[in-house]
Amino acid sequence: MNDAARLTTDDIPGLMIDIGRRARAAGRILALAPAAARNAALLAGAAALRAEAGAIALENAKDMSAGRAKGLTDALLDRLELTPARIEAMAKGLEDIAALPDPVGTVLAGWQRPNGLRIERVRVPIGVIGVIYESRPNVTADAGALCLKAGNAAILRGGSESFNSSRAIHRCLAAGLRAAGLPEDAIQSVPTPDRAAVGMLLTMTDFIDVIVPRGGKSLIERVSAESKVPLFKHLEGLCHTYIHAKADPQKALSVTVNAKMRRTGVCGSTETILVDRAIAATILPPLLDALAKAGCALRGDEETRAFSERVGPATAEDWDTEYLDAIVSIRVVADLDEALAHIAAHSSDHTDCILTEDAAAAERFLTEVDSAIVMHNASTQFADGGEFGMGAEIGISTGRLHARGPVGVEQLTIFKYKVRGTGQTRP
């Protein structure tokens, strides 16, 4: 336990400022640490996760029991649960991140001016990253590891629902840092579930360079409204799958069911299915049947409801709802134009997909839909940094500045200019 953890949690401002100071100091050391040391810390952290899998599971069981007692939804409980496979996936994720190319020091561009100045644009760490998240404890491993790989210090504040699980995972990351001879303060976990700690984090501009909030809409809205620190964020994942008139029916069926039902509680889960009227009679009966058999509640417009009595009426609110549950809204549209208009009106700019064998229609969709991730003939559940080959992601950003889409190692760096001269003076 470091000194910050020994401070009384009754003094939240003092506690958080101390954590911030330590993070800033550790970040300066980490920014200069060789890639070999950062990778060694990740590999040692992975080994610690495997060695402590039983202890992590016991702490997770406490959180799961408390979550059920609080009445958390099945979707939130699914996010909270750490099965042996998920613990192993965290360890493998750290190893995958260690295997990624080192982004720090990469020369992005270089040129020489007529006056002889040689200029390079070089990747460098951002500095200190604050991560605020709710019920998904694996974020502790993913976020800590990505920040470490990119040479950033991290301050992790998990939600009260995952408090015990997150602390157990953090202890493994700290063990990895120790084993590699790096400062433990490079990855700190806020040692209190007190919500006042979040309020402090959002004001700590002297110590934190960017904050990544991951959680429900209320958390993101609060952070967006109160933060004085820049953010990487997305408000919600209101994802669409559009089945075009020239979709392959079998492909459309399997992809759409996966996009909705593989894991309903993730932000890449499809929440609205749009079906072209020209293919509705072919695709809707088997699609509605498959979704219902998978346990999905169906809500649809009048045309959709005509195909099955199992479809309840969709309200105007449904088209703007991120369910994060086994519920989906379905609408029949006249054509690609109407699908594009619906997505423009209701998308959260996260991930939207078209299913079609028409290359021109696919290209138009990919060009005109203004979301961070646009897909053709692939499940929206692939909206994930790990699936993009990034090792993992710290979150998905739908913003317009710096990072957009999955925020991986490269997105956790900025750049500076190195200018080399031979005594030039400006006239």
Curated annotation (Swiss-Prot):
Enzyme class: oxidoreductase
Pathway assignment: Amino-acid biosynthesis; L-proline biosynthesis; L-glutamate 5-semialdehyde from L-glutamate: step 2/2
A molecular function (GO) term: glutamate-5-semialdehyde dehydrogenase activity
Catalysed conversion reaction: L-glutamate 5-semialdehyde + phosphate + NADP(+) = L-glutamyl 5-phosphate + NADPH + H(+)
SUPFAM superfamilies: ALDH-like
Domain of life of the source: Bacteria
EC id: 1.2.1.41
Gene Ontology biological process terms, A to Z: L-proline biosynthetic process
Transmembrane residue ranges: none
Keyword NADP assigned: yes
Places the protein is found: Cytoplasm
Keyword entries, A-Z: Amino-acid biosynthesis, Cytoplasm, NADP, Oxidoreductase, Proline biosynthesis
Gene Ontology CC terms, in alphabetical order: cytoplasm
Annotated function: Catalyzes the NADPH-dependent reduction of L-glutamate 5-phosphate into L-glutamate 5-semialdehyde and phosphate. The product spontaneously undergoes cyclization to form 1-pyrroline-5-carboxylate.
Family per record: Belongs to the gamma-glutamyl phosphate reductase family.
NCBIfam families from the UniProt entry: PRK00197.1 (NF001221), proA (TIGR00407)
Name under which the protein is recorded: Gamma-glutamyl phosphate reductase
Organism: Rhodospirillum rubrum (strain ATCC 11170 / ATH 1.1.1 / DSM 467 / LMG 4362 / NCIMB 8255 / S1)
Source organism phylogeny: Bacteria, Pseudomonadati, Pseudomonadota, Alphaproteobacteria, Rhodospirillales
